[in-house]
Amino acid sequence: MTYTLEEFARDCKAALLKDPGPAGREEVRTYVSRACLDEDFRDKHLSDNDAPPRTILYEDPDLKFCICAHFYEGAKESSPHGHGGSWAIYGQAVGQTVMTDWQCVQPASDGKPGLVEKVRDYPLNPGDAHVYNEEDLHSPSRADTTRLIRIEGENLDHVTRVPYKKAKAA
């Protein structure tokens, strides 16, 4: 049975109204996984090869969370980052993303980026979804074209984010 954007948004909102914290986000993660695995959902919302890298599909007027489609062509490695005071859920729909979790070893200060050390790497394959709560630092790496669904706790266009870079190896 097809999972529509309207059903997806309604399920996410109900989960976050019940619990806006980590438990509610974990429930939302299951809906992200469901949408990523739904062929009709992917065909409708994640098949436009001319789409910009990030497209907001839905922004909740009350809770402010966003459902975004991400389109990445070819290989790309992103820098370590967090989502400011917000959170995000990444769901893999097409291709594979290798995620790296990072630990902050020196906070950003005086206009200098924070320094991070690698904690672990793990793949996100189609249907996999992962919650990144406030303060969780991570970076995606793609060897080829990918499509993702990302839930943002609020529209990240309006969130100040601190820059990070890898600490030098001793």
What feature does the model see in each segment?
Residues 1-41:
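N-terminal leader/capping segments at the start of a protein or of a new domain
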Residues 48-74:
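A short glycine-rich, His/Asp/Glu-containing loop-to-beta-strand
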Residues 68-83, 123, 133-135:
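Conserved short histidine dyad/triad with adjacent acidic residue
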Residues 79-81, 99-100, 132, 137-143, ...:
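Short beta-strand His + acidic residue motifs that chelate non-heme Fe in jelly-roll/DSBH
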Residues 85-103:
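Glycine- and acidic-residue-biased ligand/ion/polar-headgroup-sensing regions
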Residues 89, 104-137:
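Short acidic-glycine-tyrosine-enriched beta hairpin
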Residues 89, 144-161:
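A short hydrophobic beta-strand segment most commonly corresponding to one strand
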